Amino acid sequence: MSQKVLPTKINLIQFRRQLRLITVIKRLLENKREVLLLYLRTYASEYEKIYNEVNEEMKKVYESYLQAVASEGISNIEEIALSQKPSLEVSSSIKVIFGVKVPTIKLDKSTIPPKPFSDVETSPYLSESYEEMTEALNKIIELVELESTIRSLVSELRKTQRLINSIDNYILPFYRGSIKFIKQILEDRQREEFSRLKIIRRILQRRRESGSG
């Protein structure tokens, strides 16, 4: 590719200027990569924490549910569940983290349905399961938001790394090779010009010497 570059002093100056600019861009991208990695480590740690909390919450929900089934019977539990219409609503918006758009998700607590059963007429385990599930919902929503955030950050990190790789593997070698090529041609021309001048000086010197003789 360097051989297609016109070897002129102007091009040499321009290529050197562009190389400096590309080097600055690469440094900025590397800084961005480091910040993204820092955010990712922070969010991954938070995700692991919430994930473990959700697991513990859901274990409690499941244990209470199994005890409620044993007490009430699966058919009664299913009848209560089927009597309810889906009502949960979540709202989502976008926030920006270091130039990366990530979702925010919130549960509308007013849409959580009230208990569709009486505490007096049903097993206390059923009420316990309902309350534990209600508490777990917010953490589940938070977990979903964290997962989406991590995916967005990973996607941006991959794009940034691809740009850095492109600069390292293609752009920088092209500019460095082009500068080397232009310098070599200009130096060769300078040497040729210097040699021609020496020859001309010798010829002129001989003429002067022969004329004076």
From Swiss-Prot:
Query: Per its UniProt record, what Pfam families does this chain match?
Result: ATP-synt_D
Q: Does the keyword Transport apply?
A: yes
Q: What membrane topology does the annotation report for this chain?
A: Peripheral membrane protein
Which BP terms does GO give this entry?
proton motive force-driven plasma membrane ATP synthesis
Keyword vocabulary terms for this entry:
ATP synthesis, Cell membrane, Hydrogen ion transport, Ion transport, Membrane, Transport
Q: Where in the cell is it found?
A: Cell membrane
Q: How does it assemble?
A: Has multiple subunits with at least A(3), B(3), C, D, E, F, H, I and proteolipid K(x).
Q: What biological function has been recorded for the protein in this entry?
A: Component of the A-type ATP synthase that produces ATP from ADP in the presence of a proton gradient across the membrane.
UniProt family annotation: Belongs to the V-ATPase D subunit family.
Q: What is this protein called?
A: A-type ATP synthase subunit D
Question: What is the organism field in this record?
Answer: Saccharolobus islandicus (strain L.S.2.15 / Lassen #1)
For this protein's source organism, the top of the classification is: Archaea, Thermoproteota, Thermoprotei, Sulfolobales, Sulfolobaceae
